[in-house]
């Protein structure tokens, strides 16, 4: 081939445009939302030189082969777990159905893959010191099994504290299983992992597909955070394992996050969620433990698992259902705010019903493009009557929902497209007025440390900044 041929580069450009057209058609046929399909298709058609490679890496969001494989693995896992006489909580499930507050969430019994269960005890854990203090103490007291799953594990001070503690417990004969996301924990050195394995800890990476191909399919990430000790205590929330979550890394410090400790039958659901992801990574089941008896009283909880292999968009539908259930108020905190049309409409309708609708977002960005897109959506929400606040002391990372005076949800899901459709997420729904009062007090203090966004602020934003926000919003469906 004559590279000096004057037509050579024309052929190359034509071939790239042909590939871009094919990729655009693929996006239109496979991307799960119309906004996402358009956000991919337009640049693939007009500027394929810059978008073909990102589409290969971040696109292909239907990922049919993976979704099919994941669903098959889930069926295998449930068949294997069926022989264990699992879920012996008939009384707890019957009691849960008698809750008037839970009845307001009419879609939840069928939306959630796990049942709502009564007789749980929950404890609110505010920020990193309280959260990891409780988790580490529970690990120290472990006698049989420890299940740990995080999106991010860092080899820093907090990560090494966890490593040391797990090695001590493994030496005592405790069975330990650790699952981390390969993308979220990409910086975790092999030496950290090898040290745990050599010490008797079973540790695996969660990846959407084995081998080198996983490097090019990084959209699906396991964002869940789970710790279960001896089948008795469970922990779920927004923290990962890293010094930043302890508020030790400026400029995002102090870090604001929330976790929950739970004791009771819903801990079995946490184990089942962990087992599902562990089975995907290993094709083996971890040991699952049930206490001889559950507490005789306590609160109603339901674990909501969601992910890209679901038959429906579970996470987005959960937020829509929670917002629609609100009669007096719905307060939501999230580090990112990139809602889909259904969630935006639900927020607007809640305002029109006279509901006190509030959003608490960070005032400091950890991802500038996402922050810019979130800012424009925040201005739209303010124009719709939603009260939007920016938390000022540090970075806000907690994911909390408070509905009226009885319903709360705390976990890993953000109010954005990635959590709605791409990530594996986990939320703990709690129906109890006393616990809701604790969450209300926590959020009231957070709102007191925040600045409310005004309509005037949106008008005063510089045109160049507005342009940047609109470009960010244009690509927000694929962020």
Curated annotation (Swiss-Prot):
GO biological process: cardiolipin biosynthetic process
Record-linked Pfam families: PLDc_2, PLDc_N
Family recorded in the similarity comment: Belongs to the phospholipase D family. Cardiolipin synthase subfamily. ClsA sub-subfamily.
Reaction(s) catalysed by this chain's protein: 2 a 1,2-diacyl-sn-glycero-3-phospho-(1'-sn-glycerol) = a cardiolipin + glycerol
UniProt GO cellular component terms: plasma membrane
One GO MF term: cardiolipin synthase activity
Active site per the UniProt annotation: 223, 225, 230, 397, 399, 404
Stated name of the protein: Cardiolipin synthase A
Lineage: Bacteria, Pseudomonadati, Pseudomonadota, Gammaproteobacteria, Pseudomonadales
Keywords carried by this UniProt record: Cell inner membrane, Cell membrane, Lipid biosynthesis, Lipid metabolism, Membrane, Phospholipid biosynthesis, Phospholipid metabolism, Repeat, Transferase, Transmembrane, Transmembrane helix
Domain PLD phosphodiesterase stretches: 218-245, 392-419
EC numbers on record: 2.7.8.-
PROSITE patterns given in the database record: PLD (PS50035)
Subcellular location: Cell inner membrane
Record organism: Pseudomonas syringae pv. tomato (strain ATCC BAA-871 / DC3000)
């Amino acid at each position: 081939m004559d590279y000096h041929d004057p037509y050579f580069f024309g052929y190359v450009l034509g071939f790239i445009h042909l590939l871009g057209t094919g990729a655009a058609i693929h996006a239109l046929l496979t991307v799960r939302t119309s906004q996402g399909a358009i956000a991919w298709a337009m640049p693939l058609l007009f500027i394929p030189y810059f978008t073909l490679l990102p589409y290969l890496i971040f696109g292909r969001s239907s990922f049919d082969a993976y979704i099919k494989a994941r669903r098959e693995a889930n069926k295998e896992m449930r068949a294997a777990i069926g022989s264990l006489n699992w879920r012996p909580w008939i009384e707890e499930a019957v009691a849960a159905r008698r809750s008037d507050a839970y009845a307001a969430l009419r879609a939840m019994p069928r939306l959630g893959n796990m049942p709502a269960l009564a007789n749980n005890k929950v404890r609110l854990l505010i920020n990193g010191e309280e959260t990891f203090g409780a988790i580490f103490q529970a690990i120290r007291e472990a006698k049989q099994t420890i299940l740990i799953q995080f999106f991010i594990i860092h080899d820093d001070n907090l990560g090494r504290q966890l490593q040391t503690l797990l090695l001590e417990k493994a030496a005592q004969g405790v069975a330990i299983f650790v699952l981390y996301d390969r993308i979220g924990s990409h910086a975790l050195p092999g030496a950290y992992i090898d040290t745990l394995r050599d010490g008797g800890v079973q540790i695996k990476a969660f990846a959407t597909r084995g081998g080198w191909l996983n490097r090019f399919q990084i959209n699906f990430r396991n964002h869940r955070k789970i710790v279960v000790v001896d089948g008795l205590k469970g922990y779920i929330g927004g923290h990962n394992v890293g010094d930043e979550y302890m508020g030790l890394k400026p400029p995002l410090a102090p870090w604001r996050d929330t976790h929950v400790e739970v004791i009771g039958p819903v801990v079995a659901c946490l184990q089942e969620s962990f087992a599902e992801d562990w089975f995907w990574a290993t094709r083996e089941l971890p040991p699952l433990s049930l206490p001889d008896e559950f507490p005789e009283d306590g609160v109603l909880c339901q674990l909501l698992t969601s992910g890209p292999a679901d038959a429906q968009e579970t996470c987005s539908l959960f937020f829509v259902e929670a917002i629609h259930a609100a009669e007096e108020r719905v307060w939501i905190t999230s580090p990112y705010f990139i809602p889909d049309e259904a969630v935006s409409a639900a927020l607007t309708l809640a305002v029109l019903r006279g509901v006190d609708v509030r959003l608490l977002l960070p005032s400091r960005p950890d991802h500038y493009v996402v922050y810019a897109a979130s800012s424009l959506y925040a201005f739209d929400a303010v124009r719709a009557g939603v009260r939007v606040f920016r938390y000022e002391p540090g970075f806000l990372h907690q994911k909390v929902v408070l509905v009226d005076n009885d319903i709360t949800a705390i976990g890993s899901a953000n109010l954005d497209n990635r959590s709605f459709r791409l990530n594996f997420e986990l939320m703990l729904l709690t129906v109890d007025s006393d616990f809701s009062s604790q969450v209300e007090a926590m959020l009231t203090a957070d709102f007191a440390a925040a600045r409310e966004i005004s309509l005037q602020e949106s008008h005063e934003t510089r045109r160049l900044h507005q342009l940047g926000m609109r470009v960010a919003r244009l690509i927000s469906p694929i962020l």
